[in-house]
């Protein structure tokens, strides 16, 4: 759920050793990221964290208060200090351990707590190195209920300072997948020299096949690196195992080939089959490791999704909302995010149709059940989501008829890992919103257009739903999803829907030609880009994609704006040490999708002009995603020697359970997020340069999640790159 909002906390101390390891040990305003057992409710009271301890438990760990994700180093001593009181004279246990199986205890000490505040100090040694440490207070076994309060919690120790100890590998950064024979080929080198330095291109046998000297790009603000560029674009011999060397530093290996992205084109799209809800994921298509039973089809222990009620007080009916895609790290399904993802897949289809990139339109391109049905696989996959979106529409005869429910998800967060078929949480429809309704209208109108040649009945159903949603949005133009509705799923709050009105009107006009929609087409593309919350740019992108469907003045204006924004994105690439079309002082949640979405705009500019510079800029954007960045990190699972493998999610949790697989090849990680919006990021990345605020850890949901609208953008770009 890429929109989960979390209080950003800094460690209690960032000075000299001993290093502070606890986040928020003073509880001045909030208890996050501290937690308590379900039977032990806790709250902040007068700057203390207080927990109501129940009676009648047996084991010490039956009632607990704690903080997870504490980094520990094997063989290092740690000192735990805290001040505590209780409403009864009790003896608790305080200690340090492992937050995940096998729940190893580093030390556990008894503390006699009374109503008089007392400060305790305990010391012990960690037996292992981990990012999964846990400070805990255990209360189980109490004969009578009481309240325990704690303040000024501190854990100090370890030799590695917070934010330190990072290994970025070689300073020579390349696209770890490879380069197209006729495309640009550059490497970024971290080197303090202010004058050019020599480089060598070596083949798989170590033979030097090309030499040159770097160009000094200089200080790169986003990464904090001083960067040189090595350009070997005129070397075109195909092969694998190439490396680029600068002195004794050698890059990760890479290839040179005519189509380095053909595999990624497939894998990034097949991701969507793997996140389908309401259907078995068949080993015949994905292999045994990724196969699983259907989730959320009303089979116990599931409590959804064939008859899902509304949250109490919001409606009195239930809907069958089975199907669709699981959104991100959770197993919720969200109209605003899902509609954008479906739009990008359908837009990739329309783009390939208009440019003659026939390989992207194959039936049988993907390993999916629909292969062989004489429909392009990319449309089959988008249909799986669109059919779910249609189910989210409020039925006739009900209040807010024609609007779309904002989302459906669990009542509370499920644990990691949780397989969809094992989810026992109640699931609820959340109230309709204008944003969701317009997203449905846009995606359904596009669906009607692209499905007309293949399934006229389905196309007609989509168009009817789109028109109904449009009228419902006009009747209810300011119904907003609450930002605080973020328990059990992301909020996806949006209180400015002028851009959604514009997008929906554009798609409806493109499909129907009805001029009444023109006056609502006010959205414009800007260098700020687009996202699930900001869809105004999609007006210009759709007009530019389908110029024959729009008035000439609209086409000329959209074309001019798309080219202007694309030029800015190209300048972003050229002005940075690493080729990212996204440039900002701070990196947001899901920054990888800012890269892919901006690259989509550049690719559209190429389609409009066929200028090679735009194509090259898209390919260089792929360089950034696949390792040519400040982290020397490929953000795409399965692609590159240093690829992300531990993305946040409940299904593919190999980091927590070795019996489970890693995320599938072609999964895009969220990428650097300089706001550090989860405890793992806060513990391990304080002081990071914006472009380096990333950690490949399953619990870092703010830097390392996957999401359907991020992978749809990657799939769009991969399809473009595979054709170039």
Which stretches of residues belong to each language-model region?
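Structural beta-strand segments of beta-rich domains
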Residues: 78-80, 170, 183-187
């Amino acid at each position: 759920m890429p929109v989960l909002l979390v209080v950003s906390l800094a460690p209690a101390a960032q000075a000299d050793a001993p290093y502070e390891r606890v986040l928020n040990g003073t509880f001045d305003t909030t208890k996050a990221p501290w937690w308590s057992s379900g039977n032990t409710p806790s709250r902040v009271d007068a700057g203390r964290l207080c927990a109501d301890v129940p009676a009648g438990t047996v084991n010490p760990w039956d009632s607990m208060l704690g903080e997870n994700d504490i980094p520990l180093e094997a063989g290092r001593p740690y000192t735990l200090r805290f001040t505590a009181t209780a409403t009864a004279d009790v003896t608790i246990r305080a200690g340090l351990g492992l937050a995940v199986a096998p729940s190893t205890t580093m030390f556990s000490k008894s503390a006699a707590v009374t109503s008089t505040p007392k400060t305790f100090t305990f010391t012990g040694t960690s037996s292992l190195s981990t990012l999964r440490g846990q400070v805990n207070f255990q209360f189980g076994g109490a004969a009578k209920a009481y309240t325990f309060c704690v303040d000024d919690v501190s854990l100090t120790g370890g030799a590695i300072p917070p934010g330190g100890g990072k290994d970025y590998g070689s300073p020579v950064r390349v696209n770890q997948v490879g380069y197209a024979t006729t495309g640009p080929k550059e490497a970024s080198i971290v080197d303090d020299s202010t004058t050019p330095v020599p480089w060598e291109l070596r083949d798989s046998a170590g033979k030097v096949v090309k030499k040159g000297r770097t160009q000094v790009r200089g200080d790169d603000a986003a990464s904090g690196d001083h960067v040189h560029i090595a350009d070997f674009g005129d070397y075109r011999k195909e092969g694998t195992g190439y490396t680029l060397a600068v002195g004794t530093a050698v890059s990760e290996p890479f290839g040179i080939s005519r189509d380095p992205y053909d595999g990624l084109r497939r894998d990034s799209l097949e991701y969507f089959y793997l996140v389908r809800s309401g259907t078995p994921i068949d080993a015949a298509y994905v292999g045994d490791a990724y196969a699983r039973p259907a989730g959320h089809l009303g089979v116990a222990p599931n409590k959804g999704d064939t008859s899902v009620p509304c949250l109490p007080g919001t409606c009195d009916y239930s809907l069958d909302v089975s199907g669709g895609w699981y959104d991100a790290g959770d197993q919720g399904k969200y109209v605003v995010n899902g509609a954008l993802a479906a739009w990008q897949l359908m837009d990739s289809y329309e783009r390939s149709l208009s440019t003659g990139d026939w390989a992207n339109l194959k039936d049988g391109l993907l390993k999916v059940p629909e292969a062989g049905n004489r429909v392009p696989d990319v449309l089959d996959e988008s249909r799986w989501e669109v059919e779910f979106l249609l189910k989210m529409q409020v039925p006739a005869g009900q209040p807010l008829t024609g609007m779309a429910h904002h989302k459906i998800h669990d009542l509370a967060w499920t644990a990691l890992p949780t397989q969809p078929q094992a989810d026992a949480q109640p699931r609820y429809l959340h109230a309709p919103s204008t944003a969701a309704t317009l997203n449905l209208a846009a995606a359904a109108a596009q669906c009607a257009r692209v499905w007309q040649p293949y399934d006229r009945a389905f196309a007609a159903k989509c168009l009817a739903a789109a028109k109904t949603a449009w009228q419902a949005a006009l009747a209810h133009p300011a119904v907003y999803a609450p930002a605080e509705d973020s328990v059990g799923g992301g909020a996806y709050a949006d209180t400015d829907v002028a851009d959604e009105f514009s997008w929906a009107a554009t798609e409806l006009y493109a499909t129907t030609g009805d001029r009444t929609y023109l006056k609502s087409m006010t959205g414009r593309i800007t260098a700020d880009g687009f996202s699930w919350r900001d869809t105004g740019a999609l007006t210009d992108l759709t007009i530019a994609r389908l110029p024959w469907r729009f008035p000439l003045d609209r086409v000329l204006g959209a074309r001019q704006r798309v080219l202007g924004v694309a030029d800015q994105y190209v300048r972003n690439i050229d002005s940075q040490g690493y080729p990212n079309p996204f440039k900002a002082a701070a990196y947001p949640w899901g920054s990888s999708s800012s890269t892919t979405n901006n690259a989509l705009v550049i690719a559209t500019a190429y389609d409009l002009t066929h200028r090679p510079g735009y194509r090259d800029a898209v390919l260089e954007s792929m360089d950034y995603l696949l390792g040519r960045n400040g982290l020397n990190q490929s953000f795409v699972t399965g692609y590159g020697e240093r690829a992300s493998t531990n993305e946040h999610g409940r299904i593919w949790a190999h980091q927590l359970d070795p019996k489970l697989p890693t995320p599938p090849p072609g999964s895009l990680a969220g990428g650097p997020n300089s706001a550090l919006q989860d405890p793992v990021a806060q513990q391990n990345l304080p002081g990071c340069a914006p472009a380096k605020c990333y950690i490949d850890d399953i619990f870092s949901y703010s830097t390392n999640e996957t999401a359907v609208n991020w992978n749809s953008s990657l799939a769009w770009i991969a399809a473009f790159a595979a054709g170039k």
